[in-house]
Each structure stands twice: as structure tokens, then as C-alpha cells.
């Protein structure tokens, strides 16, 4: 039976805590270290509707994919290093666009830091061995979430902030 030949031999279920996020370590070390959660984005194949009289449109596979945003949740350290890295990255992108009109892959002249960065999500087995990677290509930050300070929170609650990224595409490695 041909379909049985492709059936997985590993029947262990993926655990939600079995991941590691790697971003450009040289420029954004705290975003990687303090990443609490990541949501792998969905994608949509934009269909083309074929018009048939007296029938609703018949969908035909389109020519482009649309990816949702890559969403992360990051623990805020006391010095706000991770938040500062995202904030400065976003400011640098805006300043680059206003200034020289620099394009994809450009390097800001004053910092030497690339505008775009690849993000790699390593998926780990139940024994913490890497089983698969998802590589998000040419990411830019698109959102930096709110920070909520709360005087009634207990001492075991840590502040987190959301960070969103757009990317060109992803690869399963």
C-alpha cells in the first residue's frame, strides 16, 4: 500500500514547550533569550474564481501565497533590553526609509546593522534534540506590543510584551 509507506514512524506528539527561537544573535541577543512563545503563522493560497453561469464561482489555485504575521511573546527583563532592541530596530527602519530610501537588505550607515534578519524556529523532540527547523526569511518588525504594569500582581508574574514580524516566506528545513 503506497500511502502506508509515507506514514511517520515517530508517534510522539510535539510538546508546546519544545522550541528554541534564534534571531540574529549579534544584533538582537535578548529577543532570542527571553522569547516566551511564538505563533507559527498560517498561510493562504489566494484562489482565482472561475465564473460559471448559474453556479457560484469555482475556485482555481491562485498564483500567490499570503502569510500571516509571525507573533512572539517576550519576557521583559529589568533593563528592558529586549524591548529596546525591537524599539531601536523599528526606529532604524523608519529613519532609513525617510532618509536614503534604502531597500531590502540595506545596512544602516550609522549602525552597520542590516534592516532585515532571518528568524529560525528550532523544533525539539521530547529529548530536546532538534527535529525540524522553520526559517523565516527577511523578517522586519511590524508591531511592538503594550507593556502593562500592575501593582496588584504577585511576585511570580513576569511582564511580557508582544512583538510581530512580517517576512517574505518560510522554509521547512
Would you name each region that the model predicts?
Residues 1-173:
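Glycine-rich, low-complexity intrinsically disordered segments
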Amino acid at each position: 500500500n503506497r500511502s502506508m509507506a509515507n506514514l511517520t514512524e515517530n508517534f510522539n506528539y510535539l510538546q508546546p514547550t519544545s522550541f528554541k527561537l534564534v534571531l540574529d544573535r549579534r544584533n538582537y541577543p535578548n529577543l532570542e533569550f527571553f522569547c516566551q512563545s511564538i505563533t507559527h503563522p498560517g498561510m493562504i493560497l489566494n484562489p482565482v474564481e472561475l465564473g460559471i453561469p448559474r453556479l457560484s464561482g469555482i475556485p482555481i489555485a491562485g498564483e500567490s501565497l499570503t502569510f500571516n504575521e509571525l507573533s512572539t511573546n517576550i519576557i521583559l527583563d529589568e533593563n528592558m533590553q529586549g524591548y529596546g532592541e525591537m524599539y531601536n530596530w523599528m526606529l532604524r527602519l523608519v529613519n532609513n526609509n525617510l532618509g536614503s530610501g534604502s531597500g531590502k537588505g540595506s545596512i544602516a550607515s550609522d549602525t552597520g546593522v542590516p534592516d532585515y534578519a532571518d528568524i529560525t524556529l528550532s523544533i525539539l523532540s521530547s529529548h530536546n534534540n532538534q527535529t525540524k527547523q522553520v526559517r523565516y526569511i527577511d523578517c522586519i518588525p511590524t508591531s511592538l506590543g503594550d507593556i502593562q504594569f500592575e501593582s496588584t500582581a504577585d511576585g511570580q508574574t513576569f511582564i511580557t510584551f508582544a512583538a510581530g514580524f512580517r517576512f517574505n516566506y518560510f522554509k521547512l528545513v
